[in-house]
Amino acid sequence: MKTFIDFFCGGGGFSLGFYQQGFKPIRGIDSWEPAIKTHNLNFGLNDTKKNVLDFENIEEIEKLEDSDIIIGSPPCVSFSLSNKAGNADKSLGIRLIETFLKVVAVKKHKKNSILKAWYMENVPNSKNFIKEFYTFKDLNLENFAIENNLNINDIALYCKGNVLNSNDYGSPQKRERFICGEYIERLDNNIKKGFKCLH
């Protein structure tokens, strides 16, 4: 069974979609204790609350289990157009997104990586603050790149995505989200089918 880790997991709405498609959640990460307790109850896990910003330290990333997929729903309040008409401070939101991407980059490029795909969603306005690609240098992974015989200016992740409407996929509600991610060359066809909507 393919495994996944859910960052900013909340009670597990994003996890549920993957679970219903046959993937196994092995960890949920969230800084809000009620969310983690709910996620644990929903998926039979025993996680404790953790701040995603802890993973700015690469040693914390290296402690994480390896998984086939990583998903994440960074907080959208910074990017929501309903927050100060879209003029709210974006610095924390960008920092959380880039920390998530840093985790993904390390898991993607580490030796003997098993990561096959990653997937991130946020409100449509976040698209304006997410680059189409990030180098190792962009993600403060210069030392990691050098240690793994990679050029610090090489592209670590491609983040080009699209704004999708849940109503187009069977939901009775109009809900637009910016979706980005990658499926990696070692991905098998069954997982690849689920990511066709990104291209």
Show where each model-derived region lies.
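A short, Lys/Arg-enriched amphipathic alpha-helix followed by its capping loop at the start of a domain
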Residues: 17-24, 42
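Short, conserved SAM-binding/catalytic segment
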Residues: 37-48
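Conserved SAM/SAH-binding beta-strand->alpha-helix loop
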Residues: 32-33
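Class I S-adenosyl-L-methionine
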Residues: 58-67, 76-199
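Extreme N-terminal starter segment of soluble prokaryotic enzymes
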Residues: 1-4
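Class I SAM-dependent methyltransferase "Motif I" SAM/SAH-binding loop
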Residues: 7-11
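The conserved SAM/SAH-binding core of class I Rossmann-like methyltransferase domains
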Residues: 28-29
